[in-house]
Amino acid sequence: MKILALLIAIIGHEIMHGLSAFLFGDRSAKDANRLSLNPIKHLDMMGSVLLPALLLIFQAPFLFGWAKSVPVDMRYIVSQKGSLACVAVSLAGVAYNFTLAVLLAFITHLSFQKLGINALSINELNLYQLALVTFLIQGILYNLVLGVFNSLPIPPLDGSKALGFLALHFKSAFLLEWFSKMERYGFLVVFIFLFIPPLSEFFIHAPTRFLFSLLLS
């Protein structure tokens, strides 16, 4: 159930980038068949298979991953719809993750009430109830982590693209150009923010815990 929850979070994130771009007239994702709900179309060998598998094998406290990036022609969208449309496309994946987290939290509250579940009765659940609870809780958690992480204004994350195009709307291309140059170091940036404890705690884990508690309170 952990893997299923993660795949729904990461694949939906990418599909929403492509879908929002399509709504603004860019057919890149559509023509590449990347708006498909078939998960095979979106799997990245490292981010969708190997990394989650390794985290499971080593019993990591969390799973993390990513799907293949959806092709989007931001130049076309800027020329046809303006830079604010690119801000919307950049944040579409994050919006999906946060919206799904809220929806899953709502379903969790309803399920807990209907099943009479509380912290003391978790061990009394049958296999199917435990699978449902695991899926819901992990789904909330993974979507919050992805939403928080991708909101960071650091290339190549979505937050940097949104900030760059927002600056472009106000006639400044500096941020967009600088972020574009820094994307070559993207893997290193991701590694630093995920695996250096002080940074991951402050920028990812603490905000995620706060939102998680808020949704399930």
What are these regions (language model features)?
Residues 1-217:
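Hydrophobic transmembrane alpha-helices and their immediate loop junctions
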